[in-house]
Amino acid sequence: MMSNRSDFIVPDEAAVKRAASVNFHLEPLRPWLDDPQITEVCVNRPGEVFCERASAWEYYAVPNLDYEHLISLGTATARFVDQDISDSRPVLSAILPMGERIQIVRPPACEHGTISVTIRKPSFTRRTLEDYAQQGFFKHVRPMSKSLTPFEQELLALKEAGDYMSFLRRAVQLERVIVVAGETGSGKTTLMKALMQEIPFDQRLITIEDVPELFLPDHPNHVHLFYPSEAKEEENAPVTAATLLRSCLRMKPTRILLAELRGGETYDFINVAASGHGGSITSCHAGSCELTFERLALMVLQNRQGRQLPYEIIRRLLYLVVDVVVHVHNGVHDGTGRHISEVWYDPNTKRALSLQHSEKTQ
């Protein structure tokens, strides 16, 4: 049977030129894009490249990778996928001509004079179950149990002993999800920055804030993302805390640091934290540790998707996802000054809720 010529898709000349333009602008990154051992290629700012090889990050200086070249790469990529990237639409998700996934963020959604480029290379590795077994892939499966893990027992012992400095340090090191709560002027952001200093310096960090406060002088592999304070998801603003949280999922963060939860983006934060991104740190306004969960639940309900969930389900999700709540207070009336007033850490409740849900679904 003869095939009709319309069965064959022939790229038009314009599409070929657009693909060629993208590949031309990718040339400074070609050594790492062509390296089969590299899984991720990231540009946080002009002149530098971070690559992931065997779950470890490597740094390379690339002097010819200047700001203008990165802007042109973004423009060429947007044209290739028939999208837009500009000051008014500064975030772009696309697939490159060779199949790599790319995420580009330009100002004002990131620091002025910088552009964030994250390229995820597709994996062509094929493994059998026997290959996994030989690599020890199945040796560390933990049965669902009411008993706490050694790390949970360690943290609980530190908290019960009142050694809160060591408790917080280990909570950060063990990648627990931490919420710092308190009233305005209580020192939430200052404590957040102290906790961030306990994060290993070789991790890739992404901050999300409306005002630049979360500086990371000791963590070279970082990206600062920004959104306008008045931006609201319901009003279809192009850049909000929620859109940047979703963008983070394509930027290979080890941790996401969100300066403050204020509204519907709380739903996205919980969703991201529940997806396996441990070690996130954020803050919110609340009068106590217990009220923190009430505040977070109310803010989840400000999200269109969050409103579809029953309040009880939201509360259970919060207890499952949030590991530590630290409440800070400014005792201006009693002379105690800024201090931690409460610490919530209850792995037993978390474990019971998890087992309860598991039993219901069986």
Curated annotation (Swiss-Prot):
GO terms for molecular function: ATP binding; ATP hydrolysis activity. Its main location: cytoplasm. It is found in: Cytoplasm. ATP binds at residues 182-189. One of its GO terms (cellular component) is cytoplasm. One of its GO terms (biological process) is secretion by the type IV secretion system. Pfam families: T2SSE. InterPro entries: P-loop_NTPase (IPR027417), Sigma_54_int_dom_ATP-bd_1 (IPR025662), T2SS/T4SS_dom (IPR001482), T4SS_GSP_E_ATPase (IPR050921), VirB11 (IPR014155). Keywords: ATP-binding, Cytoplasm, Nucleotide-binding, Virulence. Transcription is turned on at the beginning of the stationary phase of vegetative growth. The virB operon is essential for intracellular survival and is not involved in the invasion process. Constitutes a major determinant of virulence in mice. Virb11 is essential for pathogenesis in mice but is not required for intracellular survival. Belongs to the GSP E family. This is Type IV secretion system protein VirB11. The gene is virB11.
